[in-house]
Amino acid sequence: MDPKYQRVELNDGHFMPVLGFGTYAPPEVPRNRAVEVTKLAIEAGFRHIDSAYLYNNEEQVGLAIRSKIADGSVKREDIFYTSKLWCTFFQPQMVQPALESSLKKLQLDYVDLYLLHFPMALKPGETPLPKDENGKVIFDTVDLSATWEVMEKCKDAGLAKSIGVSNFNCRQLEMILNKPGLKYKPVCNQVECHPYLNQSKLLDFCKSKDIVLVAHSALGTQRHKLWVDPNSPVLLEDPVLCALAKKHKQTPALIALRYQLQRGVVVLAKSYNEQRIRENIQVFEFQLTSEDMKVLDGLNRNYRYVVMDFLMDHPDYPFSDEY
């Protein structure tokens, strides 16, 4: 089997490609760019495509996937597509309609994976960040166990092959896992993860529960002012990462991606640059030594780029716990 189609078995028996293509772009990037880059990614060999309601690009990403199916490049079952339920749709009665709305935009019959995007419910409705007259985000109180039950129904209905969570801490994962009458465990927890925030404790916990850790922001984010402090350290300029890149004749990005794969983490590579999209798929063509891995482990400083500080007051804000 072509190494670039390596997959990991999920706890529900489905398989997820270990390298994914992240489609998020800041609002100023024209939406139709998502069509081009998703097609490029599929042509380069990516089979795992990650999007979300919040990214506001599912029509474009769906169009790209369908056009690569139509031209015979791939079959639908070759593609592993992830979408995410946004926090304003966590009221149980809103979950399935939100997924159906995503499917309608995508013009697909099912998603391979549907995630709770963040563990924080916000005021219901179409506005992603509903604010009061003082500009403060309006929270909602929802029992996420009840939201999860409807996620399970979406899986049973065949609208989502697998269901999981994103940006949950250990305590929040346990809450779902210990839920009375749990039918399906989350197959994964997609979290920020890179050499500066290697999530080793959360990774160990997830492995112990047969939950896959999926790394977003694996290259240190796009550093967009909406989400990230402009003074934050630039991961891909890290001297240790650059020295390893030189040693292996690879890019620093490839070292950061390879690091995750060798730890058993599924990794998302986000790029809207054609050359880098093609480069990133080369992550399967080299290996890091155990010494290299130790050196990379040593870069951890529990540094989080995506802090979401405007939600810090939320009772379910996930990043105050150690992991």
Swiss-Prot record:
The record's account of how the chain is modified after translation: The N-terminus is blocked.
Highest taxon above the source species: Eukaryota
Residues annotated as binding substrate: H117
Main localization, broad class: cytoplasm
Location relative to the cell: Cytoplasm, Cytosol
Tissue: Liver specific.
Paired cysteines (S-S): none
Activity control note: Inhibited by nonsteroidal the anti-inflammatory drugs (NSAID) flufenamic. The oxidation reaction is inhibited by low micromolar concentrations of NADPH.
The reaction(s) this protein catalyses: a 3alpha-hydroxysteroid + NADP(+) = a 3-oxosteroid + NADPH + H(+); a 3alpha-hydroxysteroid + NAD(+) = a 3-oxosteroid + NADH + H(+); 5alpha-androstane-3alpha,17beta-diol + NADP(+) = 17beta-hydroxy-5alpha-androstan-3-one + NADPH + H(+); 5alpha-androstane-3beta,17beta-diol + NADP(+) = 17beta-hydroxy-5alpha-androstan-3-one + NADPH + H(+)
Chain positions of site Lowers pKa of active site Tyr: K84
Biochemical pathway: Steroid metabolism
GO BP of this protein: androgen metabolic process; bile acid and bile salt transport; bile acid biosynthetic process; cellular response to jasmonic acid stimulus; daunorubicin metabolic process; doxorubicin metabolic process; progesterone metabolic process; prostaglandin metabolic process
Keyword NADP carried by entry: yes
Keywords: Cytoplasm, Lipid metabolism, NADP, Oxidoreductase
Site feature Important for substrate specificity, where: L54
Gene Ontology molecular-function annotations: 5-alpha-androstane-3-beta,17-beta-diol dehydrogenase (NADP+) activity; aldo-keto reductase (NADPH) activity; aldose reductase (NADPH) activity; androstan-3-alpha,17-beta-diol dehydrogenase (NAD+) activity; androsterone dehydrogenase [NAD(P)+] activity; bile acid binding; bile acid transmembrane transporter activity; chlordecone reductase activity
E.C. designation(s): 1.1.1.-, 1.1.1.209, 1.1.1.210, 1.1.1.51
Any one GO cellular component localisation term in the record: extracellular exosome
Subunit relationships: Monomer.
Membership in a protein family: Belongs to the aldo/keto reductase family.
Disease: 46,XY sex reversal 8: A disorder of sex development. Affected individuals have a 46,XY karyotype but present as phenotypically normal females.
Function, as annotated: Cytosolic aldo-keto reductase that catalyzes the NADH and NADPH-dependent reduction of ketosteroids to hydroxysteroids. Liver specific enzyme that acts as an NAD(P)(H)-dependent 3-, 17- and 20-ketosteroid reductase on the steroid nucleus and side chain. Displays the ability to catalyze both oxidation and reduction in vitro, but most probably acts as a reductase in vivo since the oxidase activity measured in vitro is inhibited by physiological concentration of NADPH. Acts preferentially as a 3-alpha-hydroxysteroid dehydrogenase (HSD) with a subsidiary 3-beta-HSD activity.
Protein name listed in UniProt: Aldo-keto reductase family 1 member C4
Source organism of the structure: Homo sapiens
Lineage: Eukaryota, Metazoa, Chordata, Craniata, Vertebrata
Gene: AKR1C4
